[in-house]
């Protein structure tokens, strides 16, 4: 069965997961990502990795500053997605969006939940010298990273593991688990 997907993500970690979904039988309706930010001395506008990739594959992009508005609620209702997949979006979804009927909200989280709930789970696993971490696919509920875990995959952490290497590995695992 082909699903209509609303994708919500921002950093490079989310790109392989969006690619995997885009190359599947499912249809990406639209992508939500963080608004562009001004960077460096010249204050040049910089778009998120997800925004850039979405433009490459011609998927409409939306980057609201706030999600808890009537406009965003109406917009998401109008899209009629079957599922919203959230990957390091950087915004907490408001309850009124999570309560929309007929939409399942799924999160791809870079830890073996419940360990390292919240932001920076990869960094926290490395800083705490964990021997393993992993990726969790979970149903989103109003409390942060507290919904039921649907599937997990473990990943070993070695002494020479750094953030970039582990993040890339976890993103690839997430891109397979989400299907």
Model region roles, listed by residue range:
Residues 1-41:
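N-terminal Rossmann-like dinucleotide-binding module
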Residues 10-13, 65-68, 89-92:
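Short beta->alpha connector loops
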Residues 15, 19-23, 74-77, 95, ...:
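Amphipathic, non-transmembrane alpha-helical secondary structure
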Residues 27, 58-60, 104:
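Conserved beta-strand segments of alpha/beta enzyme cores
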Residues 38-80:
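N-terminal glycine-/serine-/threonine-rich beta1-alpha1-beta2 phosphate-ribose binding loop
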């Amino acid at each position: 069965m082909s699903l209509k997907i609303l994708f919500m993500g921002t950093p490079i970690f989310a790109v392989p997961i969006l690619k995997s979904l885009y190359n599947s039988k499912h249809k990406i309706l639209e992508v939500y990502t963080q608004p562009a930010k001004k960077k460096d001395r010249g204050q040049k506008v910089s778009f998120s990795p997800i925004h850039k990739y979405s433009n490459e594959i011609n998927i409409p992009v939306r980057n609201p500053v706030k999600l808890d508005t009537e406009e965003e609620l109406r917009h998401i209702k109008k899209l009629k997605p079957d599922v919203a997949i959230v990957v390091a979006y950087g915004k907490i979804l408001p309850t009124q969006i999570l309560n929309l009927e007929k939409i399942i909200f799924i999160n791809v989280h870079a830890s073996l939940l419940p360990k390292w709930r919240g932001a920076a789970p990869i960094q926290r696993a490395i800083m705490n010298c964990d021997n393993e971490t992993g990726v969790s696919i979970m149903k989103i509920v109003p409390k942060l990273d507290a919904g039921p875990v649907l599937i997990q995959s473990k990943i070993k952490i070695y002494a020479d593991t750094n953030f970039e290497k582990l993040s890339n590995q976890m993103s690839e695992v997430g891109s397979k688990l989400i299907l």
